[in-house]
Amino acid sequence: MSLKRTRARERALQALYQIDVAAEGIDDALSRFWKSFEPVEREVMEDAEGFVRGVAAHRRTIDDTIEGVSTNWRLDRMAKVDRNVLRLAVYELLRTDVPVKVAINEAIELGKKYGSESSGAFVNGVLDKVAAGLPPERRRTDR
């Protein structure tokens, strides 16, 4: 796990949360978001923006995937932090360049850090179900 990628995920989650709360466009939200931070490493900022734009571009598929495995939980009823941790993680799970275990573990840590006491377990449960639906070659632990 790269520390820069971890920081990028953290910034992406914060930006996704802000976008969710403010219900505004990505460009305006990202511009305002970055102004609220001390200078951020270029690579971290680029990766974070890539995550945010990727989630936005695939949001319908991501949300459908989450709702498909979230028994008795609609997205609009989930805590905003949990919802956005899941969106970020599912985006990574649907890509092929991020190991499944890394995406899940990073999401669990984000849930624990920014969510409620039960967020880590909730995120883990949902993402385990999403991962179970991935093609077998994608689920391999050596990826």
Swiss-Prot record:
Q: Which HAMAP family match?
A: NusB (MF_00073)
- The organism encoding this protein is Anaeromyxobacter sp. (strain Fw109-5)
Summary of the function given for this chain in its UniProt record: Involved in transcription antitermination. Required for transcription of ribosomal RNA (rRNA) genes. Binds specifically to the boxA antiterminator sequence of the ribosomal RNA (rrn) operons.
* One of the protein's GO biological processes: DNA-templated transcription termination
Q: What's the protein here called? A: Transcription antitermination protein NusB
User: According to the UniProt record, which cysteines are disulfide-bonded?
Assistant: none
Instruction: Give GO MF terms, alphabetically.
Output: RNA binding
List the GO cellular component terms: cytosol
